[in-house]
Amino acid sequence: MILNKRLKLAYCVFLGCYGLSIHSSLAAYQDPGRLGAPDSWKTAEFNRQWGLEAISAEFAYARGYTGKGITIGVIDNAILSHSEFSGKLTRLDNGSYNFSYDKQDNMSFGDHGTHVAGIAAAKRDGAGMHGVAFDADIIGTKLNDYGNRNGREELIQSAARVINNSWGIAPDIRRDAKGDIIWLPNGRPDYVAFVKSEVIAEMMRSKSSVEWGSEQPVPTGGHSAMSTLLRAARHGKLIVFSAGNYNNYNIPEAQKSLPYAFPDVLNNYLIVTNLSDENQLSVSSTSCGQTASYCVSAPGSDIYSTVGRLESNTGGAVNREAYNKGELSLNPGYGNKSGTSMAAPHVTGVAAVLMQRFPYMSADQISAVIKTTATDLGVAGIDNLFGWGRVNLRDAINGPKMFITKEDIPQEYYVPGSYSEKQFVVNIPGLGNIVEPGTPVERRCTSSECSFDSWSNDISGHGGLTKTGAGTLALLGNNTYRGDTWVKQGVLAIDGSVASNVYIENSGTLSGEGTVGAFRAARSGSVAPGNGIGTLHVLHDAIFDRGSQYNVEVADNGRSDKIAARRAFLNGGSVNVSLERSQNLLSQNEAQSLLGNKYTILTTTDGVTGRFENANPSYPFVKVALDYRGNDVGLGITRTDASFDSLASTENEKAVARAVETLNATEPVTETAKRSVAIPAAEEANLLQSDGGEAQAVNEEASIVAGHPIYESFLGFTSARELQQATRQLSGQIHADMASAQINESRYLRDTATERLRQAEGRRTATDIKADDNGAWAKLLGSWGHASGNDNATGYQTSTYGVLLGLDSELFGDGRLGMMTGYTRTSLDGGYQSDAHSDNYHLGLYGDKRFGALALRAGGTYTWHRIDTSRSVNYGAQSDREKAKYNARTGQLFIESGYDWTSDAVNLEPFANLAYTHYRNEEINEQGGAAALRGDKQSQSATASTLGLRADTEWQTDSVAIALRGELGWQHQYGKLERKTQLMFKRTDAAFDVNSVPVSRDGAILKAGVDVSINKNAVLSLGYGGQLSSNHQDNSVNAGLTWRF
């Protein structure tokens, strides 16, 4: 009996010798292969293995599919630790290699498994050759491994998803009367031909023992090899099996016929025959024969791949004696071999590449893709020699070409009980979800294809398609498969054509702008034509049942989704209207208005029967109404009674929303832009039935009206949050923030003048004012501030740096008069990617009058500002960048009185001051899109008083003098606390006020410093100044070293 013969590996017996080459390790390889450029992958390494181009592997690589993340299993002899497998090979055997001896005791290494593994997945590193799935990992186990480790069961339970089997049982070879091998004219031995009926019968006799062995971890011996394969297939693995090297008149043996006993695993089984480089079946290759319905062909003749060889370290013999003496080395290299053993790993590599390409597909579906996209060879269709044909990665990466049922298999090759499934069930699970849970091949779907994928092949066959999972599948080809199409979850987008009926149920959605035979949307099923806005064509009937959904997208230019069918039956269902908002309206000066538009959303040639239940917009500011007109269903859009400011939550938001409300236009764009919606005279009295049940008359003609881009963008809001985000960005708060900051930071000028006067009076002040004996002085200014946002206004950050200069002189012995100037630069970072900068030029007068211990100080300053602002507007699909340059001026007057109270321990000065500040900006004209703002000349003022106490003291030691100073004050603001600016959108007159962060009514003034006199010429100083309140915090720090020469 065939199965009782000793298993032996189908090496390259009778197929000639192979060459051997060695390479050394290389520097890090820079792959020239590029996405979208198949020819860039054809390097010297690629071209050394002719099978890669024969299966069009370069097209898969150019799409980014290389087997990455996939693990290949190999059942063979032990795989050598070759550099081509560095970091990617796991061995599950007992650690020994396969060696053989001839009659003279010469020893050789069994590198068959090494050669096979290289064809499937050798690395692409610029050296030698590379495998089909060069980024895949490999797990290898020995076919005959009689140690304590059960490597085959470990392989079944591993992450390997495809298992290569390049082994088999050879038939007898005919011999002459002398016992010598009979050779055929082509140089091949004359193998005894297997007989189909006998092979299948032998398989059936082994069925019970094979099945019993597969139901538990598979032991070695007996029928364990076939039990291993059956168990692996039922655990979700794809089994790839070499057909055998028993001449092309022969057929595969019993192991390859396992699906005849177990048809449930046929879809997980692939037999592979050997092609020459001329696309002919090799004379050595067994034909597909009875396995034709699950057989393919692949290159297998003279294939260059990884090998190993035993070599003597001493130049002596390579035999058992030398091995025992340790004189032999096992060296990796490359060589050529031929046989179906070399063809099978091509298909294994193809499967790994496709498993990366279609991460959601099961092994049986990958098998279907491989078979149905194979290039037909020989007799048209499935045939005895080539089966489905030569594997073709270029086509395979574009999805299946047939949904197979038994009707698609020629009767002579049909395996009873196989291809029983009528539907190809594809689960596009959504990114991050689990596929094939509870199996050894369970995995998390993490690539982009898990959420969206497209198949571009033309799909035929007697089967149908069932779409499940939350993701989207797009069919781009001309699909003529005869089975039904079901959409049970997620989205099926028909952008080519599907001849069959489509049934949509549960949470499924039919979309696209192609053609279907007919569709029926059941409860919870949805139809959403187009990809964006488009038309779905239906050759026959479009049917909506109660509880179904028709999702219609409309645009402001009169375009809308549409269904074009022969007939429509409306048994209920809802029309859900959404607005196309992919267009950036803010980049336009004028937009077509959505309001008043009439759309045709369903058109037929033979009539509409019934009505939809309702129409449901998901927008608070628009409402829709349906219009039934003979063969068509129309839809109109009008404004609801809700005002924009009804969804605003703050005064700034409400102010902007009310201004946008005034932007609604009522004039047509142009006469030629009018779009008429013709209504037959008999239908003029028809009423539009809105979702609220109100009857509204249909206008005979609707014109496209010019709308303001901002107004039109507001119509698409679905929530209060969207409106609030938009109004905050449109408000132009940065201008109010800059005005507020300039008023706040005017204090640095009056503080500097006051400090200089106190310094000249002999009071201890900060040493950051550097003065000479002639009254000239200078001060470097550096500060930063923060305004805390509130419910109405976002906060902002400021920084100011610059220099102030002055000159003063004593007047009448008890007074002083001076002037100051300077330059500072203020930077402000506001909310929502807005910022501003101001170049500030200062001029001021100051003076004092002393009455003994009492000092009266006063002054005034004037500042010219050159302001640059920039702000971003981004909400939904809308985006714009607005910039402005304008001038402003700040003037202030201040007065202070202080009383000097001196003691031996500390010097105190109670003080009180009063300041008035007036800010005025010139016209504001932003440059940008529709969201650009303008503002007239406007001004605002502030009055503040401060009561406080200054103190200083000094310690003298033998080597240094230390002086401490401080100031504590209470500041009070008078009048209104709001800091606001009036703005309006360009080309409109509707003004609105935008508020910055309000000023705190009361706040604290803090100053502290220390001076350390190192010697009579050097003084080291450090100081801090701050204004702190609930809404604003301004801080400055100064440090310096003064050296007198």
Swiss-Prot record:
Signal peptide per UniProt: 1-27
Enzyme class: hydrolase
Pfam family, one: Peptidase_S8
Listed GO CC annotations: extracellular region; outer membrane
SMART domains: Autotransporter (SM00869)
CDD domains associated with the record: Peptidases_S8_Autotransporter_serine_protease_like
EC number: 3.4.21.-
Ranges of residues in domain Peptidase S8: 49-397
SUPFAM superfamilies noted in UniProt: Autotransporter, Pectin lyase-like, Subtilisin-like
An example Gene Ontology biological process: proteolysis
Keywords of the record: Hydrolase, Protease, Secreted, Serine protease, Signal, Zymogen
PROSITE patterns membership: AUTOTRANSPORTER, SUBTILASE, SUBTILASE_HIS, SUBTILASE_SER
Active site, renumbered: D76 (charge relay system), H112 (charge relay system), S341 (charge relay system)
Cellular location(s): Secreted
Keyword Isomerase attached: no
Entry GO MF terms: serine-type endopeptidase activity
Propeptide feature ranges: 646-1045
Residue ranges annotated for the Autotransporter domain, each copy included: 769-1045
Record NCBIfam families: autotrans_barl, autotrns_rpt
Name assigned to this protein: Extracellular serine protease
Source species: Serratia marcescens
